[in-house]
Structure formats: structure tokens, C-alpha cells
Design a protein with these regions (language model features):
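Binding-interface segments
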Residues: 13-244
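Glycine- and charge-rich intrinsically disordered segments
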Residues: 1-32, 248-302
Length: 302
């Protein structure tokens, strides 16, 4: 009986969050805010928020304000939030907070805005500084040499003799590669071995470490390692060597920011240089009272 009540409560909460998001989207004040940054594309983008929430049981555990705020960040970059497209995503994340009353760390499900690798490439293209750019998985039979000191990478000249890419086996992946060429002629490349990317993920993602230690699948690094690896190399390449437009600088700061129930943005997954952000929906009265979300663990993927 207790289990049935718990399931019913969880389903009620998820329905409530979905209803809250739908209610907020229908408000004139919200429509106006999105129209200010997206123009005529705003209605289509708002509809996509509903679809994203409907397709994720984990997002339905997050506060509606958190979801809407993350979506608004994506809207300011004019990037779609369908994670399958690879530009940007709204990802559920367990943000640990200290409760002074219980003197314990407690997990709070929140929505996290994430730039994906195609999103960084898109913003770079829009800047008008870049002539060419790409990032790719590199298989072992495609790599001739890599010098970690100079950063120089040499690939085979005849890819027709390489077979591992067609096979697509992860154990044959040597690493991940990104490069760009500016209109000025300046060219830069970055290669990271699979081990280097793995170490990067372990260092900067508490969610990924939790997954590895507890055999879970709640982190984007666990469920889509390749996409996160490509994002890592292109982001590191651009942030170190690229010409960053204002939007690119903002995107690097906003990437993986989570929003709490008070509408404040912070980095919840080992991200440095915390920047506070105002919730654009904090002054908009919701038609439905938000229900308290407790006892839910995003690491328990359904």
C-alpha cells in the first residue's frame, strides 16, 4: 500500500510539473518574453518545451521555473532544445544542498541548461570569424601519430583502407578531434585521447562519478559519452584559441547552469567561475501552486 501511495504521489507530481509548464507557456507575460528574443519563432519554441518535458520522466521531477528558465537561456541563443538535434538541451540534474536543520546534504532535482557541440559550432559560424570548423571521433586505424607536447596530430592519407569507423565499436576509438580555420588564415586543432576525455569527465562531473561508483545511468556523460566528448574538445579549443563573440562568451558561462526554486543560477556539477543569473520568470504569477518535490532521485532512471 505504501509503495502504491508513493507511486501515485510521484505520478501526481510529474503531472503537476507538466501542467505548470503548460500553464506558464500559455501566459501572455511568458509569450512576450520569448517573443522579445525569438520574434515569430517564439510559438514554435514554446511548443517544443512542452514536448521536451512530456518526453522526459526525469524533467517532470524538476521545478517548472527551473525548466522554463533553462529554456529561456536556450532561446536567447536561438538554439533548439531537442537533445536529439545536438545543439542544446535541458537536462535533469540532482543538485546537492546542505540542510542546516537536518545537518545533511539533500538532493534537489533541478533543470540544467546544456550547450551541445553543434551549439558551439553554430554560434561560432554566426560570429563571422571562422572559415571552416569541424569535430569528429577518431578511430585507431585513422591515427598515425599524436604529440601531446606540440599538439600536432597526423592522420592517414588514405581513409579508404580504414574499416573501424564503419564498424563503430567504441573500443576502437582513439580519441576526439576538433579544428578550425579563421578567415585570417589562422588554423588550430585539438586532439584528446579517450583516456584524457574520460579523466576530464571524472574530474568535472560529479554526476558521472556517481554513475560509475553506483552503476547508474543518470549523467549525460553516461548516456551519451560521444556527444559530451565532442562538446568537450570543441569547447576547449574555442575557449583557448578561438575568437569569442559576445554570445560565445555567454554560452561558455551559461553551459551546465542549474536553476533552483528561487530562480538563481549556479553551476551544480564542478563548474568553476560561478555566475549568478536572474530568473526571468520570478515575477510572473503562476496559475497553479507548485507542489513540493521531495524524496525523488534522478539517478534512478526509469
Amino acid at each position: 500500500m505504501a509503495e502504491q501511495n508513493a507511486v501515485a504521489t510521484q505520478q501526481g507530481t510529474q503531472l503537476s510539473v507538466a501542467a505548470q509548464v503548460k500553464s506558464m507557456i500559455s501566459q501572455d507575460a511568458v509569450k512576450k518574453k520569448f517573443a522579445e528574443v525569438l520574434g515569430q519563432k517564439a510559438p514554435q519554441f514554446l511548443a517544443s518545451i512542452t514536448n521536451v518535458v512530456a518526453g522526459s520522466a526525469q524533467l517532470k521531477k524538476c521545478p517548472a521555473n527551473s525548466i522554463m528558465s533553462s529554456a529561456f537561456v536556450a532561446a536567447t541563443y536561438d538554439l533548439p532544445i531537442d537533445s536529439n538535434l545536438g545543439f542544446a538541451a535541458i537536462v535533469p540534474y540532482n543538485n546537492s544542498k546542505y540542510n542546516p536543520q537536518t545537518r545533511q546534504w539533500e538532493k534537489h532535482p533541478e533543470a540544467q541548461f546544456q550547450m551541445m557541440y553543434k551549439g558551439f559550432i553554430q554560434l561560432a559560424i554566426r560570429s563571422g570569424y571562422y572559415e571552416k570548423m569541424n569535430c569528429s571521433v577518431v578511430y585507431k586505424d585513422e591515427l598515425v601519430s599524436y604529440n601531446p607536447i606540440t599538439g600536432e596530430v597526423e592522420f592517414v592519407t588514405d581513409f579508404s583502407k580504414c574499416t573501424q569507423r564503419a564498424e563503430g565499436k567504441s573500443e576502437n576509438i582513439a580519441g576526439y578531434y576538433a579544428w578550425f580555420k579563421l578567415l585570417t588564415g589562422f588554423r588550430k586543432e585539438l586532439f584528446m585521447t579517450t583516456a584524457e576525455v574520460e579523466n576530464h569527465a571524472r574530474k568535472y562531473s560529479t554526476a558521472y562519478r556517481y554513475d560509475l561508483e553506483n552503476n547508474k545511468k543518470g549523467s549525460k556523460w553516461t548516456t551519451d559519452f560521444e556527444a559530451m566528448a565532442l562538446k568537450t574538445v570543441i569547447k576547449m579549443l574555442l575557449s583557448k584559441w578561438g575568437i569569442l563573440s559576445v554570445d560565445m562568451q555567454r554560452a561558455i558561462q551559461d553551459d551546465q547552469k542549474v536553476y533552483d526554486e528561487d530562480g538563481e543560477g549556479s553551476y551544480g556539477d564542478n563548474q568553476p567561475d560561478i555566475v549568478e543569473a536572474q530568473d526571468p520568470f520570478s515575477n510572473i504569477e503562476q496559475k497553479e501552486e507548485e507542489q513540493q518535490i521531495g524524496g525523488l532521485d534522478l539517478e534512478e532512471v526509469e
